[in-house]
């Protein structure tokens, strides 16, 4: 009996020492070569793009028919994606011209740390200064991130349990699913300061969103409107989707990415469960195309002729590479292989622009706001950002 117990004990030790499925999953050498080539091609594209940008202007999109490069100042939500994408490409290529351009663009972005009129400071400041801190740390970056988190927290309502998104109507407390991706900034602020206030705001916002934004099938509304005085839900809408009952693709992507980050930062299993549910909704959806780059809405009219949204695909791809590390067995393999398929597609001529085209942007076929007929089948800077992140995550697997 003692001999049998000894054998069983050794077996348990061996099982515990075995690598997880995520650790055993291997990258594809051919795809790694494709990614490296895509990074070099992307670097060349951005060198064309940077020549067209004054110091205080940031790329948003490009209209092929009119040959118009659309840019913005530092204040819109998209400002941080360009320097962030440059930094990811610098990591992959070691091309210092990309690093220098990213550093040049941090200057005009810096003042946004005090911007209390936007919920998008995570996108704006963590994608830019957060990546800069990770790659080339400077003490001043810490303070920028802390101040940005403070500004974001001024938009938090304890009564509602969320960070306000839009300010267009003070009588309605509007919260969009996109906010989930801004919470990463708050966790960084808690790490930098030791102040748990930021952490608690992020957790409260995520919990409230999980309760009210999601349907029984784990698809998400875009917008939930709360009564600011009582915290009660007044209305649920999908402003950028096909209808209030539809699953806007980028909204599902934001939810997946956000709850994956929530699990990473808290290790609370309910967030892992939520991320898994969202991933399974996406990957099992009958309207998901073979290359897994979604239509702009999973319920879009006109499928299979509806426009794709590569920005949603890029966000989902990057999130799945991370989520695959937190699960095991067949689930990890499913996420990893799906993300590989998406990355392969985005690195192909079907989505990756040919040299000297697309206004210098990397990916084609993004959709900004279909219901408003805005930015349909165009490049989008946030698609580029999450594409460059997905490439780096694959290389670092």
Give the residues covered by each predicted segment:
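Glycan-recognition and catalytic cores of secretory/periplasmic carbohydrate-active enzymes
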Residues: 23-397
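Bacterial Sec-dependent N-terminal signal peptides
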Residues: 1-30
């Amino acid at each position: 009996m003692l001999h049998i117990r000894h054998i069983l004990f050794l077996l348990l030790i061996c099982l515990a020492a075995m690598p997880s499925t995520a650790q055993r999953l291997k990258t594809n050498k051919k795809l790694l070569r494709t990614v490296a080539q895509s990074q070099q091609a992307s670097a060349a594209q951005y060198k064309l793009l940077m020549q067209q940008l004054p110091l205080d202007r940031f790329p948003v999109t490009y209209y092929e028919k009119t040959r118009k490069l659309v840019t913005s100042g530092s204040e819109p939500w998209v400002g941080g994606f360009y320097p962030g994408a440059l930094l990811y490409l610098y990591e992959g290529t070691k091309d210092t011209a990309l690093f220098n351009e990213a550093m040049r663009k941090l200057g005009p972005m810096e003042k946004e740390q005090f911007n209390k009129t936007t919920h998008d400071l995570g996108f704006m400041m963590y994608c830019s200064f957060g990546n800069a801190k990770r790659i080339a740390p400077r003490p001043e970056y810490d303070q920028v991130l802390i101040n940005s988190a403070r500004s974001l927290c001024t938009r938090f309502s304890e009564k509602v349990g969320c960070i306000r998104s839009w300010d267009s109507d003070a009588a309605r407390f509007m919260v969009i699913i996109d906010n989930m991706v801004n919470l990463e900034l708050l966790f960084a602020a808690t790490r930098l300061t030791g102040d748990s206030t930021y952490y608690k705001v992020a957790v409260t916002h995520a919990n409230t969103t999980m309760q009210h934004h999601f349907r029984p099938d784990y698809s998400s509304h875009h917008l939930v409107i709360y009564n600011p005085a009582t915290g009660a839900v007044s209305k649920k809408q999908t402003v950028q989707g096909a209808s209030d009952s539809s699953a806007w693709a980028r909204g599902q992507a934001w939810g997946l990415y956000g709850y994956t980050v929530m699990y990473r930062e808290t290790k609370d299993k309910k967030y892992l469960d939520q991320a898994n549910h969202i991933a399974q909704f996406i990957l099992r959806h009958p309207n998901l195309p073979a290359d897994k780059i979604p239509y702009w809405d999973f319920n879009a009219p006109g499928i299979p002729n509806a426009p794709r949204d590569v920005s949603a695909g890029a966000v989902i791809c990057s999130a799945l590479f991370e989520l695959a590390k937190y699960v095991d067995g067949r689930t990890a393999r499913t996420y990893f292989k799906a993300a590989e398929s998406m990355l392969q597609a985005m690195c192909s001529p079907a989505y990756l622009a040919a040299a000297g085209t697309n206004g210098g942007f990397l990916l084609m076929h993004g959709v900004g706001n279909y219901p408003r007929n805005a930015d349909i089948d165009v490049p989008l800077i946030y698609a580029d950002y999450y594409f460059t992140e997905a490439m780096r995550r694959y290389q670092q697997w």
